[in-house]
Swiss-Prot record:
Its main location: cytoplasm. Keywords: Cytoplasm. The keyword Cytoplasm applies. This is Uncharacterized protein YJR154W. It is found in: Cytoplasm. GO terms for biological process: fatty acid alpha-oxidation. GO terms for cellular component: cytoplasm. Present with 1600 molecules/cell in log phase SD medium. Belongs to the PhyH family. InterPro entries: PhyH, Phytyl_CoA_dOase-like.
Amino acid sequence: MNTDSHNLSEPYNIGGQKYINMKKKEDLGVCQPGLTQKAFTVEDKFDYKAIIEKMEVYGLCVVKNFIETSRCDEILKEIEPHFYRYESWQGSPFPKETTVATRSVLHSSTVLKDVVCDRMFCDISKHFLNEENYFAAGKVINKCTSDIQLNSGIVYKVGAGASDQGYHREDIVHHTTHQACERFQYGTETMVGLGVAFTDMNKENGSTRMIVGSHLWGPHDSCGNFDKRMEFHVNVAKGDAVLFLGSLYHAASANRTSQDRVAGYFFMTKSYLKPEENLHLGTDLRVFKGLPLEALQLLGLGISEPFCGHIDYKSPGHLISSSLFENDIEKGYYGETIRVNYGSTQ
């Protein structure tokens, strides 16, 4: 039974492959001709007013000199032994030339101290994500505040020859859907991202490209066919960063150089996006041994498609019983893939 579905329309089948019709995104929105990266860049990382305004309008803000280059060198040294990839990654979710270092905060104290705990990053994330609500309980009204928490912190090494990654919204892990709007509306975001360049990042070496203004797009606005004047490759120096909303379409680009491009991407989310009870921390793993797959999944030890709750892109249940979760990676992270047909009707 499907209790909450936001399908665009009913797909149709041709030769065993499902398709859906969509139109090219023609409207430039906020990305008017002549727009340059300077329009959504700040020189002062503590100019909160400017950062917030640019994120509201464009969905992102480039922050110059976010972290000292010497700290980038320290992070690269700490993270280097932890890069990996799986052979099944042949373009999805990453090109075969890309390696990742997941759970970076556990491998690098510098990442935790100087990136994730950075005051500006936390303050901006709280601005967009914090919630304060009032709940009736008996004869009183209780006010409760939900803060932020780290959703993910992964360092990506885009190697020479890597191809373009497909555009996506980061907040798909929480099945967040958005309706088209003319201007930013608070209360719809579940993530704020921070991309930090640990090496120089430009169009040639695989910089992140972003569709400016796409945080305002709805389900019928296609990230696969749009006016390319809305596309920007984030051109930044080592130590610079880019803040962006979880609803902004973004992707890694092809690396046409002979050098690796290394950057870390860190996402804050709402702190209530988790179970009420924490059953894992402080629990001996032997408690879970011998439990059937269904029980382990009900206890939160399986991935929610596409990636939510993973440990190194595997279900946490791998630590309990690798045999029960043996097809976790090979089967892919998506329940179904539907191809898009542009500009035609069934």
